[in-house]
Each structure stands twice: as C-alpha cells, then as structure tokens.
C-alpha cells in the first residue's frame, strides 16, 4: 500500500476531500448530514475520506472557517439548472454530471410530488394559500397523507375546509391538468424555494456551533470574528447554549429534570456555573439534591470533553421538549428574555 501524504494546503483539495474533512471534524454525532447524501455522494466522500491520510490542524481550521464564513455571508441563494451543472462539474467526472443532469431534466413531474414531500409544511402552505382550492386539493391528494395533514393545519381554517371539501368530491384528474400544475410548481415554486425558506444560513450555523465542544466553538467564533464580525455576532445571538437553561421557569426545569438521565445530569452540572447548579438543585426535592451532590462529589475529576458532551445532550433534550410544546426556551439574545 502506498504511503498517504500529509495534507497541508487547502488549495490542493478536491470537493469530496473538503467535504470529507468537514465531516471528520464534525465527528460521529452528525449522522443526519450523511443521511442527506445519496449513494453516489456517500461513495465519493467515503473514498476521499479513506485516502486523506493526515490532515494538518491548520488545514482543518482554514477549511472550517472558510465553510462557516461562506455559509454566513451567502444569505439567500438562487438555484438553477446551469448553476447546479457548473457546481457538479467542479468535482464530478463530466459523464456522471451529464447523466445526473439528464435525470433531473427528465419528464416534468417525474419526482415533483416526492420533492414537495420534503418541503417544510409552513413554506408550502404559504404558497398554496394563494392558489385556487381545487388546485390545492389536487396537490395535497398527490403528496403523502401525513404531509398533507401538516400543510392543511397551516392553512387558514375556512380555506382549508374548502380544500378538504374539494378533495372529497375529487374525480380522477386529467393528465393535461396534472402536467400544468406540475409545471407551475416547478417554475413558480421550486425555483424560488431558497428565497421562501424561513431558515437562514446563520440559524444553520448556530446549530452547528451548538454541537461543538466549548474549545472548538471559542476557536472558530474568534476566527470568524476576524473575517466577519457581524456574522459571528448573529450566530452567537442565535445559539442556545447550556447556560441559557437558567432562563427556564421552574416548571420547565422540572420537566427537563424528568427527561434527563441522572448520569448525564450529574456530569453536566459538574461543569455548570454555581448559579445554574443551584437553580437545578432548588427544583429537586431535598433528598434528590443531596444524592445528586454526593454523586457529583464521588466522580472526582472529569474530562472537559465529557462535560461538554453531557451539556450538549441536555440542551438537545430541552430542544426536543420545546418542539413538543412541553417547555418554552429563550435564546441568548436580550429580546428572548421573559418578563413575569
């Protein structure tokens, strides 16, 4: 086997190699990124990853800062057939690009309903509310039932009921009408989807930063501040970190305590501020607080990496509870503070 050379210059890296380094740097917890790739992309990135060899720390840092800075400064983007073709050609063989683009360009509506199934329900509802109820009925009859239900829930009630009525009376739709609806969706909705999406790049980067350990987070925030201070400040304001749990009300703290494994809680509180630690203890029974303190004392010295992982885990539990409506989170910005 040939000896793998060390990677010391970002300029010499291909697209798949850059993706491989970013994924390695983010670690094994970011499986959702892999799930978004198709089989061919996974194969290319995996091959690049296996052949990387040693990557210097400076290259990793430069590449991640380049990635973060690019995502933060780009803002809204507009995709097109030509832009996609140019992007793919920068890292894929031309014959693969041609085959893939031919598939994308194929018969109108070939994958349109599947694509709509992956569009956020609020975004899709925001578009459909301006269409005729009959058109909406056709669209919702073609997507999966669970997604159709979420879209209907986002529509104005009277309009949604009218759409439901049309769906109940619907007869088989002529192919010509379906083709026209699909073409309209492709040209008026899908092509502008990036501009209608409510989630911006700063929110995405804040989520990524939330999953860094504190040393990595501090390093990249500092590096980003040197390149783009405004972007760094926006990301910091959008981040929800462990210390922000101090803004939970007593009911929220108690709900979080019930949803957090005891071992994880002890490890997370081991590295918490006195204020936050006391807040959690005050929402436990006297006996439970005493046992928790004893468990923490018996741990002895613990690794910062393990504390960070436990705290990130608790933040994720809090976010999951908030998504279910069981607690309310306030971010790090002043506008999110609660008045009682």
Swiss-Prot record:
InterPro entries in the cross-refs: Flg_Motor_Flig, Flg_Motor_Flig_C, FliG_a-hlx, FliG_M, FliG_N
GO cellular component assignments: bacterial-type flagellum basal body; plasma membrane
Main location: membrane
Bilayer topology annotation: Peripheral membrane protein
One BP term from GO: bacterial-type flagellum-dependent cell motility
Family annotation (SUPFAM superfamilies): FliG
One GO MF term: cytoskeletal motor activity
Top-level taxon of origin: Bacteria
Keywords, ordered alphabetically: Bacterial flagellum, Cell inner membrane, Cell membrane, Chemotaxis, Flagellar rotation, Membrane
Subcellular localization, as worded in the UniProt entry: Cell inner membrane; Bacterial flagellum basal body
Function: FliG is one of three proteins (FliG, FliN, FliM) that forms the rotor-mounted switch complex (C ring), located at the base of the basal body. This complex interacts with the CheY and CheZ chemotaxis proteins, in addition to contacting components of the motor that determine the direction of flagellar rotation.
Family per record: Belongs to the FliG family.
Protein name: Flagellar motor switch protein FliG
The species this protein was found in: Caulobacter vibrioides (strain ATCC 19089 / CIP 103742 / CB 15) (Caulobacter crescentus)
Gene: fliG
